[in-house]
């Protein structure tokens, strides 16, 4: 799986949430949209935790860039309810609300 969040605490929280499941392996952590696009193309992850708001290119824009090539299961991470609801327009499997 790939975890993308521009905040170190956000990435750490996701890792901690999933730490007990040996079936899940984090292959890369990203902080920007372009890093995420490269990681998806390099690793073809089955699962992607993706922050909606990233500096520069948004998480949604990054996902749109690779959508025709690779379709990981996506769980959007956001601090805003409106973004969470919009995530389902992009076929998100689920979302996590940041505190």
Where are these regions (language model features)?
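CheY-like receiver
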Residues: 38-99
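Short hydrophobic/Thr-rich beta-strand motif most characteristic of the beta2 strand and flanking loop
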Residues: 23-31, 39
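Conserved sequence signature across two-component system core domains
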Residues: 4-5, 30, 48
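Structural signal for short hydrophobic segments within the conserved structured cores
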Residues: 2, 25-28, 94
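Acidic phosphotransfer microenvironment of two-component signaling modules
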Residues: 8, 31-35
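Short helix-capping segments at alpha-helix termini
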Residues: 19-23, 69-70
């Amino acid at each position: 799986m790939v975890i993308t969040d521009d905040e170190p605490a956000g990435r750490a929280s996701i890792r901690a949430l999933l730490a007990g499941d040996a079936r899940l392996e984090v292959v890369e952590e990203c902080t920007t949209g372009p890093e995420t696009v490269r990681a998806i193309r390099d690793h073809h992850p089955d699962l992607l935790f993706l922050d909606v708001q990233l500096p520069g290119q948004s998480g949604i824009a990054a996902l749109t860039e690779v959508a025709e090539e690779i379709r990981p299961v996506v769980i959007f991470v956001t601090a805003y309810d409106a973004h969470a609801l919009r995530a389902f327009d992009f076929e998100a499997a689920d979302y996590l609300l940041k505190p």
